């Protein structure tokens, strides 16, 4: 719905504060009641947002989560890398379920296209790395961003000039085929096939293409609220994450301005989503890790329990997630980088029944105490976590809707997290459905 206040609407950015998979999709869906539009501003179809609505599970990879609400307009900003094939596959899935999508989806003409050679390079590189692989989803996200930075990328708007598109595509195919065949030892891609398939998408895309930046400004100026939906998480950010074990885009709150074409002064509130514990998919350092399905040395019983009770499997890849205790020192880093206004704690109910709960509040690194996640993967890998222990609770927190109804031990745990990171917890998610939520401060109403 529209903002009730006269004048410019309020804007909320929802970002993950960990390594992704924090439960952003449910919270975005919950907040959509208060927003006219929902905006994706980075990433591609490598991130799956899982929604449970009326007991039905829906996984969105590219289209903003607001599409589940009939009155909401969804935007894909210029910072997104767009696979037309993946887009229309997702549209068809949603429309087959009875949702109207294409008349409510607006796509930036400046969004970078993911084309088949990006996917081929992504997969060939991972195969060549062998045991040293980064853990990419193999969907062409990284290579597409590489082309964007190198200024050779093809964008959505290029599809509508077939001659220009064909010329640019030929140059790109020649370049990438050299990499595929001469360096990666993979098969070449076919220029004509890519050209024909790409141009076939043009008339289907065109009705949805817009000057997203200008539309967002106009919608906001008319007094309507907007929400900016981040993908992945801060610790996977290409600049601020555990590099090189990161994604290929900026997934911090600041990227919402550049990736959607809005002024940073228009971002009123930053909501940081964090689980009550930590998970990570793929390779990379993880100081508070307890369980890794692929590592026999990481089979702690509590970690296994977190994975099973929390159903920790990637929504896009299906890969088992690594699990560990909540790392408040890493969370503090994310809070500072993003300028987080308030936190939303998700999956608190997964901790129900644990006798003891540990919270990482810092590290021992090179003989010194460190209270915030250091920069660089080597330093993070060398960190020995420093824990505080809390008594668990036997009462169920599942579906609890008020703060006072939480077990006292759970409230003590959450309050300590607030103290360590220095900002309030404004929301607590106690189950997958949108109404299984404790609201302490409303992101659209915080002064």
Swiss-Prot record:
Substrate binds at residues 315-321. Belongs to the adenylosuccinate synthetase family. Binds 1 Mg(2+) ion per subunit. Signal peptide: none annotated. The active site is at residues 21, 49. The lineage of its organism: Bacteria, Pseudomonadati, Pseudomonadota, Betaproteobacteria, Burkholderiales. One of its GO terms (molecular function) is magnesium ion binding. One of its GO terms (biological process) is 'de novo' AMP biosynthetic process. Homodimer. InterPro entries: Adenylosuccin_syn_GTP-bd (IPR018220), Adenylosuccin_syn_Lys_AS (IPR033128), Adenylosuccinate_synth_dom1 (IPR042109), Adenylosuccinate_synth_dom2 (IPR042110), Adenylosuccinate_synth_dom3 (IPR042111), Adenylosuccinate_synthetase (IPR001114), P-loop_NTPase (IPR027417). Its cofactor is Mg(2+). HAMAP family: Adenylosucc_synth. This is Adenylosuccinate synthetase. PROSITE patterns: ADENYLOSUCCIN_SYN_1, ADENYLOSUCCIN_SYN_2. IMP binds at residues 21-24, 46-49, 137, 151, 232, 247, 319. Its EC number is 6.3.4.4. It catalyses: IMP + L-aspartate + GTP = N(6)-(1,2-dicarboxyethyl)-AMP + GDP + phosphate + 2 H(+). The keyword Nucleotide-binding applies. It is an enzyme of class 6 (ligase).
């Amino acid at each position: 719905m529209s903002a009730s206040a006269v004048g410019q609407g309020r804007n909320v950015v929802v970002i993950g504060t960990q390594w992704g998979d924090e439960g952003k999709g449910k919270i975005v869906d919950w907040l959509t009641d208060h927003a006219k539009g929902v905006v994706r501003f980075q990433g591609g179809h490598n991130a799956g947002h899982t929604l449970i609505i009326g007991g039905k599970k829906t996984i969105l990879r590219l289209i903003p989560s607001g599409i589940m609400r009939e009155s909401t307009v969804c935007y894909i900003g210029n910072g997104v890398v767009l696979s037309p094939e993946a887009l229309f596959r997702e549209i068809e899935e949603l429309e087959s379920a009875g949702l109207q999508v294409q008349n409510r989806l607006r796509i930036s003409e400046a969004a970078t296209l993911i084309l088949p050679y990006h996917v081929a390079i992504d997969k060939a590189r991972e195969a060549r790395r062998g045991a040293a692989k980064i853990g990419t989803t193999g969907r062409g996200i990284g290579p597409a961003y590489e082309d964007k930075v190198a200024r050779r990328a093809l964008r959505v708007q290029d599809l509508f000039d077939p001659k220009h598109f064909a010329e640019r595509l030929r140059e790109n195919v020649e370049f990438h085929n050299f990499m595929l065949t001469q360096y990666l030892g993979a098969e070449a891609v076919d220029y004509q096939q890519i050209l024909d398939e790409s141009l076939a998408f043009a008339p289907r895309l065109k009705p949805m293409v817009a000057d997203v930046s200008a539309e967002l400004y106009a919608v906001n100026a008319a007094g309507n609220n907007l929400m900016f939906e981040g993908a992945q998480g801060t610790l996977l950010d290409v600049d601020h994450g555990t590099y090189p074990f990161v994604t290929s885009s900026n997934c911090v709150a600041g990227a919402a301005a550049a990736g959607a074409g809005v002024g940073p002064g228009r971002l009123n509130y930053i909501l940081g989503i964090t689980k009550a514990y930590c998970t990570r998919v793929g390779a990379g350092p993880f100081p508070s890790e307890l369980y890794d399905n692929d590592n026999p040395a990481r089979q702690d019983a509590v970690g296994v329990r977190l994975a099973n009770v929390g159903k920790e499997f990637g929504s896009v890849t299906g890969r088992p997630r690594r699990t560990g205790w909540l790392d408040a020192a890493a969370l503090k880093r994310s809070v500072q980088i993003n300028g987080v206004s308030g936190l939303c704690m998700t999956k608190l109910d997964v901790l129900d029944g644990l006798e003891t709960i540990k919270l990482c509040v810092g590290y021992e690194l090179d003989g010194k105490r460190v209270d915030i996640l250091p920069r660089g993967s080597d330093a993070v890998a060398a960190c020995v976590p420093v824990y505080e222990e809390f008594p668990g609770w036997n009462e169920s927190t599942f579906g609890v809707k008020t703060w006072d109804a939480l077990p006292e031990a759970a409230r003590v745990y959450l309050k300590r997290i607030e103290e360590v990171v220095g900002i309030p917890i404004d929301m607590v998610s106690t189950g997958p459905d949108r109404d299984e939520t404790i609201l302490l401060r409303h992101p659209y109403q915080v002064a």
